[in-house]
Design a protein with these regions (language model features):
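Short polybasic linear motifs
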Residues: 329, 334-336, 341, 346-348
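Short metal-coordination and nucleic-acid-contact micro-motifs, chiefly zinc-binding Cys/His arrays
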Residues: 262-266, 300-303
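Short cysteine-rich clusters marking metal-coordination/redox-active sites
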Residues: 267-271, 307-310
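Membrane-embedded alpha-helical bundles of multi-pass integral membrane proteins
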Residues: 1-265, 314
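Zinc-coordinating Cys/His ligand positions in small cysteine/histidine-rich zinc-finger domains
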Residues: 95, 304-307
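Short functional micro-motifs and their immediate structural scaffolds
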Residues: 272-279, 312-319
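Short recognition patches in nucleic-acid-associated and regulatory proteins
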Residues: 273-301
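Short cysteine/histidine-rich metal-coordination sites, predominantly Zn2+-binding motifs
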Residues: 251, 282-293, 322-330
Length: 350
């Protein structure tokens, strides 16, 4: 699919730059691997259930209302990422720099690599650049203007944002005890090193071209190509895959909203509300698909019909009866009262 889009978008490769071929090949492989892993991820019973229910709830309610709510979720989860700000202001700024720097870099790089965007100078004035998108001229600007500065330095801006995010992330990982205890090199440190290599080598191209008179440009260009290719190949298999999983989390927000507004499930033991009926029913179905049987013989048909506090109480009571035989904790001389929700455990043999 990506290959077809490259051919069509570049007008049968007419505007495709062969010097960017390694980037294009790595992008094609990365897209195929991401699509395969995403399809496998969606086949997991819990993920599949959330996915199906999320789309059903989106189309089931008012389309306009749900579209507005989806737009608000996109703004909160992707543009501002306020859910991270509630945890830590440092992590919020760090994620904003990394996410916006990465999105800006991909928004500029991929259309250029695929040949969807190309530049040309006017025939009558070589100081004026024309911007073509899918072969259609959309803008032109003269060299030395603000538009030229912003266009030609977009990747530099993204690299600076990424470097700031990396610095904040390293500061957190070197100073917070929790991060130090849980971090792993392959999952937490390696992605930062790869991002640093891409951003630093990209800025190195600008430094070489503008201030070093092209000295070392070929070596830096090869290094940058190698680091970008490695990053693209790493996308489907490492921590960066959560970037593609994140949009699916928006369906969970629809699910939670419907669960709060819908009928609630009542505990079979204390008869208190503890979750939505939809969530309990979905959980039962997922457990069946995972080959877990939590059905009970008694007044309560299924273990998931019991609220978490009662589950803890039942566990303690039945363990006490099993270990001590009499009383709740072996101190009460009265015979134990069987709980109607769970079968009595077999007494230990003497």
């Amino acid at each position: 699919m990506v290959s077809l889009l490259i051919v069509v978008g570049s007008h049968n490769l007419r505007h495709f730059d062969l010097t960017l071929l390694p980037y294009a090949l790595a992008s094609i492989f990365s897209a195929a691997a991401v699509a395969y892993r995403y399809a496998v991820w969606l086949q997991r019973p819990p993920t599949k259930r959330y996915w199906q229910q999320g789309w059903r709830l989106f189309w089931q309610g008012g389309l306009v209302r749900n579209s507005v709510y989806l737009g608000r979720l996109l703004f909160d989860h992707f543009a501002t990422q306020r859910f991270i700000g509630r945890r830590s202001h440092l992590r919020w700024v760090m994620h904003l720099c990394l996410s916006w720097g990465g999105m800006l870099a991909f928004a500029v790089t991929l259309p250029l690599v695929f040949g969807w965007i190309h530049f040309a100078t006017r025939v009558d004035n070589l100081q004026v650049y024309q911007v073509f998108v899918l072969g259609v001229k959309v803008q032109e600007f003269a060299l030395g203007t603000l538009s030229a500065f912003l266009v030609f330095n977009a990747l530099n801006f993204s690299a600076v944002l990424v470097l700031v995010g990396i610095a904040l992330s390293l500061h957190r990982r070197l100073t917070e005890p929790g991060a130090l205890a849980l971090q792993q090199f392959g999952n937490d440190v390696l992605p930062l090193l790869m991002l640093f290599a891409v951003a630093a080598s990209g800025l190195g191209l600008t430094v070489s071209a503008r201030w070093l008179h092209g000295h070392g440009f070929a070596f830096i260009a090869l290094t940058h190509a190698a680091t970008v290719t490695a990053l693209l190949l790493y996308l489907p298999f490492g921590k960066f895959f959560h970037i593609f999983q994140r949009p699916a989390q928006l369906g969970v927000a629809f699910y939670k909203q419907a669960a709060q507004a819908g009928p609630q499930a009542q505990c079979g033991r204390c008869h208190e509300s503890f979750a939505s009926q939809m969530q309990v029913a979905d959980l039962k179905q997922v457990l069946v698909e995972l080959a877990f049987d939590y059905r009970l013989d008694g007044p309560v048909d299924h273990y998931q019909d019991i609220c978490p506090p009662c589950r803890r109480k039942l566990l303690a009571l039945n363990q006490a009866r099993t270990l001590h035989g009499v009383g709740s904790w072996g101190t009460d001389p009265r015979p134990p009262t069987p709980d109607p929700c769970l079968p009595d455990p077999r007494p230990l043999s003497s």
